[in-house]
Structures are given as C-alpha cells and as structure tokens.
C-alpha cells in the first residue's frame, strides 16, 4: 500500500528530529526500506550533513574501520538532501526513486503550481511542466509498484516566502491526483494556523483518511518544563480569552 502521513507539532517540539530518526533508522539496503530526508532549508541541510559526516568517521574508527571524510559525506548525502536536488534528479530520471520512504521537512513551504511552473519555465527551460511541488513529489514515490510512504512534517502558519502553498496544497494533490493513497492525519491539522479545515473535509469525502493523535508533538523541547506554554500562546493568538485565563 501507499501511505502519506502528516505530523504536526508546536514550535520546538522536535518534528525535524523525528524525521531524522526515521531516516537514519531505515538505511537497510538489503530490506529495501531506505529513507530520504528532504528539506528546502539549505543551511539546515549543510549543518546536518557536516555533523553526520563527522559522526560517521568517528563511529567507523571506533569500530576499527577506516573511512575518509569524503566517503562518509557521500553516504550521508544519500539520505539527507536538498529537496530541489531530489526534484531535479527525478525530472531527469523517470524510474522510481531508490528510497521507498521520503520525509519532507517543513512541508507547508512547498510551492504552489503557479510558482513551480514559473520556476521550471524560467530557470530550467521546461515549458510543459504542469505540477505543483507536492503533486510532483508525490508522483515520484507513486512510481513504486509495491509500496511507498511519504511523511510530511508540518509547521502551522510558517509559510514564509512567495509561492509557498501551505499544507492544503498537499491535501488537494492527494484528493485530485492520488486518491488511492491512504492518508494519516494529526487531528491538530484542523487548527486555525494550518488553514486546512476545508481541504481535510473534501479529502475525507473521497479518500481513505484516518486521524491519529500520535502524529502531533505537543510539548516543546525548548520549554519542556512548561508543557502548557505552547498551548497558552496558541490560545492568545486565537483570542480565546477563557482558555488563556485558565492556563495562566
């Protein structure tokens, strides 16, 4: 089967860490369950690649093996990539991706169809590209004949730059193009900051949708001794006076 999961969490709850844990724990080439962690945040990817490269060299030495930093970096780059490099690779290559599991960090920042088409035409010289970024990325994993998993790590209200679609673009892509995929959603995706309520309702009418409380990370690791802090801030931003007063 093919499944797409949406993981939500308060700021600092560790969504990126969850994605990295999945990616690093599923590297078994023999079992065919390798994963790739994808992010559009280049500074983050650079830091992660460097840190994991150094760690790989140290671990190999502790195990009595020798590996150069260049060799270690190549292995790390296989499972932590810039999302645009991944996209460009499978524009050129029509085969199914090497990985069966793809984790998209900050999935809400994927591009709309208009932004993606414009970029492909102006920067890549591709005039017949007609997908939003979520549509194309899901289509890559959909090339697998047996199974595939997409994990979207979602930050609420964190669409920052021009053309960033929000999580509704992913939900619309599933509804319109990949309705045979099973969908697992954090119930918190209904919250106002995700602006996805209407898209979820449409998706429920057409697709196999299941809600799972475990897909929400509720406590910020930055303030783990004040577990209600994030909820308090949310209630204030939602102008929920009663809830804010109670929590305060």
Label every model-predicted segment.
Residues 7:
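Hydrophobic anchor at the beta1->P-loop junction of P-loop NTPases
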Residues 37, 103-105, 132, 136, ...:
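Structural recognition of the conserved hydrophobic beta-strand(s) that form the central parallel beta-sheet
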